[in-house]
C-alpha cells in the first residue's frame, strides 16, 4: 500500500476523534497548544488518540522574553506577518512546563529541539536553541 493511501487527514475537533475512539500511530499538534484554553486537557486528548508506544509531536513557542520579542513584537507588530493579538505571551509554555504536562498525560518526551526561520532562504531549520520556537517528540506509555 502506498504511503499516501495510508495517510488520514480530516478537519475535525480533537474531542470528536477521542469520542469516536480513534487512535493513531502518530499524532501531531503543530503551533496549536498555545491557542487552547486548557493545555493539560488538550494533551490528555492527544494521548488518548495515540496508540501505546506511538509518537506524539508538538511544536509551540517558549514563554521567554526572546520569544515575546520575536513572536509577538516582531511577527505581529513590526513585520505584520500575523494579525495583532494572534498570540498571548501568558499562553506560551516553557519546555519544562510542556514536558510536565505531557508526562501527566502518559507521554514520555524523548527529544526536543528548537527551530529557527531563515528569512533569506525562507526555510525553517532545526536548532539546539529552544528559547523561541521548539518542537517536542514523545511516545505514549
Residue ranges and their predicted role:
Residues 60, 77-97:
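Acceptor-substrate binding/catalytic loop of class I
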Residues 63, 116-117:
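Short, solvent-exposed loop/turn segments at secondary-structure junctions
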Residues 66, 119-121:
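Generic structural signal for helix capping and beta-alpha/helix-loop junctions
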Residues 67-78:
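Short, flexible, mixed-charge acidic loops at enzyme active sites
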Residues 122-141:
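Core SAM-dependent methyltransferase catalytic element
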Amino acid at each position: 500500500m502506498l504511503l499516501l493511501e495510508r495517510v488520514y487527514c480530516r478537519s475535525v475537533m480533537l474531542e470528536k476523534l477521542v469520542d469516536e475512539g480513534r487512535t493513531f500511530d502518530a499524532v501531531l499538534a503543530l503551533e496549536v497548544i498555545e491557542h487552547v484554553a486548557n493545555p493539560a486537557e488538550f494533551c490528555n486528548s492527544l494521548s488518548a488518540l495515540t496508540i501505546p508506544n506511538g509518537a506524539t509531536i508538538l511544536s509551540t513557542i517558549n514563554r521567554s522574553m526572546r520569544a515575546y520579542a520575536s513572536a509577538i513584537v516582531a511577527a505581529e507588530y513590526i513585520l505584520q506577518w500575523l494579525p495583532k493579538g494572534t498570540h498571548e505571551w501568558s499562553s506560551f509554555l516553557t519546555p519544562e512546563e510542556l514536558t510536565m504536562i505531557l508526562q501527566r498525560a502518559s507521554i514520555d518526551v524523548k527529544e526536543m529541539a528548537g527551530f529557527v526561520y531563515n528569512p533569506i532562504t525562507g526555510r525553517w531549520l532545526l536548532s539546539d536553541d529552544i528559547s523561541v520556537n521548539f518542537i517536542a517528540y514523545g511516545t505514549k506509555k
